[in-house]
């Protein structure tokens, strides 16, 4: 049983904690918060020991009715693996602690590739991650791109990918971010960071990405165009999506053509937090003509990396020998079936 510490119990951390707790081969030994808030009370309700970075704030936690188990360093000492889910650019500052303690650690996509020297996706490079001390799980957008690009590459060969990311402005609980009434190019320059990030996992893929931010909180939307080496076949593309455990197919019969409807569907399915771990690829958008493949896919920014974190833990602790086995273990423990099989 692998002992896992969650350093940063926020949007991603709380989801990873619940996903880890659901597994049969790992357990949560603690989570960390910087201040008492609603998420800290959820951690208490879940039975996760609560640790804090600054022990001078212990009184504030205890006044709020939250028992403090110790410092973040205490938590890390007790763990086999540390999932760093602190905000972007904060995680890298925690690396010296993990190194000092000789612990395995994994970071999120908000950190640069260099923090770990290895960027991870369960479907693409699981075997290369086995036994590593440090791993970076790529961002939500990069995760979604890697999953589908890798499958298309295996089936038809990829000559070039052009992807446009229409990104949500903020997560639902982020009240200090926007925009409220604007479409913001982020960045104005081409490529956006997503293309080079894909290449940290799939270095042989030629890819150009562009990105913008829009006033919504639900999900990201990708418009993807792939030039293939072999002539592409629409039916075969649909089949490879259906056969992948982390790719969902939004069928015409569902009548869904927006991220809002997707999230409503996830709620009706009874998904915890209405989370969508899978790429949500719109079947009607799949266009194949000679060597050109186009489609839309929606990516739930709060959720798709959660299952990847669990698989990364298995890889670095050698609990599984390949990605297929780990993905099945993770999905089964979460009772997760891609949405293509629900309508």
Swiss-Prot record:
Stored PROSITE patterns: GAPDH
EC id: 1.2.1.59
Ordered alphabetically, the record's keywords are:
Cytoplasm, Glycolysis, NAD, NADP, Oxidoreductase
Please name the catalytic residues of this protein.
140 (nucleophile)
Where D-glyceraldehyde 3-phosphate binds, per the record, is at: 139-141, 194-195
Top-level class of the enzyme under EC nomenclature:
oxidoreductase
Known pathway: Carbohydrate degradation; glycolysis; pyruvate from D-glyceraldehyde 3-phosphate: step 1/5
The places in or outside the cell where this protein is found are: Cytoplasm
Indicate the segments annotated as coiled coil, or none if absent.
none
Residue positions annotated to bind NAD(+) are: 11-12, 110, 168, 301
Reactions accelerated catalytically: D-glyceraldehyde 3-phosphate + phosphate + NADP(+) = (2R)-3-phospho-glyceroyl phosphate + NADPH + H(+); D-glyceraldehyde 3-phosphate + phosphate + NAD(+) = (2R)-3-phospho-glyceroyl phosphate + NADH + H(+)
Q: Does the keyword Hydrolase apply?
A: no
Q: What is its main location?
A: cytoplasm
Biological process terms from the Gene Ontology for this record are: glycolytic process; lysine biosynthetic process via diaminopimelate
In terms of Gene3D superfamilies, this protein maps to:
Dihydrodipicolinate Reductase, domain 2, NAD(P)-binding Rossmann-like Domain
GO CC annotation:
cytoplasm
Give the molecular function GO annotations: 4-hydroxy-tetrahydrodipicolinate reductase; glyceraldehyde-3-phosphate dehydrogenase (NAD+) (phosphorylating) activity; glyceraldehyde-3-phosphate dehydrogenase (NADP+) (phosphorylating) activity; NAD binding; NADP binding
Query: Does the entry feature the keyword Metal-binding, yes or no?
Result: no
Q: How does it assemble?
A: Homotetramer.
What is the similarity comment for this entry?
Belongs to the glyceraldehyde-3-phosphate dehydrogenase family.
Name recorded for this polypeptide: Glyceraldehyde-3-phosphate dehydrogenase
- The scientific name of the source species is Methanoregula boonei (strain DSM 21154 / JCM 14090 / 6A8)
Q: What is the taxonomic lineage of the source species? A: Archaea, Methanobacteriati, Methanobacteriota, Stenosarchaea group, Methanomicrobia
Give me the gene this protein comes from. Answer: gap
